[in-house]
């Protein structure tokens, strides 16, 4: 996996394909190659250059040790812009899952001239007590599914428990501060946007994709009626076809 220096760290990233640049941002604690294993080769084979990084403090982009200050989503957005600039991409599409959806939407709002299209799923523009309760229900790794725990343990080893506890504490602090992650910025997103959601997502209630959809003018919303949090993995064929059609649709004049 190649790496490139950006302010504060050496960021590792997966790169595949040739064509239009497509940045894929993983979820909390996730890695680009792991979270998007069903998307990277698929899109790379269809005239996209996929860039799927390990965000600051995650996966192979360590050090630094990951922390969660009040601006961590915005810091991650700045890192992603720095990565794409270092790779020579001035304009690019962005796909984000979960925390990656939050980062991606912030990017599209902050520098709309750089983000050509936006695909987001599993994110939320604000926090409620329901999400905090859901996080605390899985605060102990023993409460995770064996598969999820095994996947993350392979990346972080014994550091996983403390890292995840710090993450949940960071979410609690954001909620205590009012819980607005980027809801106030949604109106600044001007690029074509596709919002996807699993109707049975146990972590992100349906009010969140609805709020993002309503907040971004002209955005589209697609619901996977039986989907949970990992719609891009569980329904990879349908997900890939839907997002590919959106990303390649000619812009309206």
Segments from the language model and where they lie:
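Conserved HGGG/HGGXW glycine-rich cap/lid loop of the alpha/beta-hydrolase fold
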Residues: 7-63
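Helix-rich cap/lid subdomain of alpha/beta-hydrolase
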Residues: 117-182
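Short alpha-helix in the alpha/beta-hydrolase fold that links the catalytic acid
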Residues: 191, 205-214
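Conserved hydrolase catalytic core segment
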Residues: 90-129
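Acidic catalytic loop of the alpha/beta-hydrolase fold
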Residues: 200-204, 229
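Short beta-strand/loop motif that positions the catalytic acidic residue
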Residues: 189, 195-197
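Active-site loop/oxyanion-hole signature of alpha/beta-hydrolase fold enzymes
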Residues: 37, 52-95, 241
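Catalytic active-site module of serine/aspartate enzymes centered on a nucleophile-bearing elbow/loop
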Residues: 219-220, 225-253
């Amino acid at each position: 996996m190649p790496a490139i220096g950006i302010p504060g760290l050496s960021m590792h990233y997966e790169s595949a394909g040739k064509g239009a640049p497509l940045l894929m941002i993983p979820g909390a604690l996730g890695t680009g190659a792991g979270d998007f294993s069903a998307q990277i080769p698929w899109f790379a084979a269809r005239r996209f250059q996929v860039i799927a990084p390990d965000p600051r403090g995650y996966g192979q982009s360590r050090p630094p040790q990951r922390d969660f200050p009040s601006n961590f989503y915005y810091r991650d957005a700045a890192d992603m812009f720095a990565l794409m600039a270092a790779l020579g991409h001035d304009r690019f599409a962005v796909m984000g899952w979960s925390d990656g959806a939050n980062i991606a939407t912030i990017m599209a709002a902050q520098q709309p001239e750089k983000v050509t299209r936006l695909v987001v799923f599993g994110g939320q523009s604000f926090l409620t007590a329901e999400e905090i309760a859901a996080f605390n229900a899985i605060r102990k790794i023993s409460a995770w599914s064996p598969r999820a725990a095994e996947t993350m343990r392979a990346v972080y080893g014994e550091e996983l428990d403390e890292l995840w506890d710090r993450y949940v504490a960071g979410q609690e602090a954001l909620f205590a501060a009012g819980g607005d992650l980027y809801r106030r910025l949604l109106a600044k997103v001007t690029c074509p946007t596709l919002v996807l959601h699993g109707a049975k997502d146990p972590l992100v209630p349906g009010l969140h994709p609805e709020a993002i959809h309503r907040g971004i003018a002209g955005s589209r919303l697609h619901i996977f009626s039986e989907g949970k949090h990992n719609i891009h993995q569980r329904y990879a064929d349908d997900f890939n076809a839907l997002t590919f059609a959106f990303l390649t649709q000619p812009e309206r004049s």
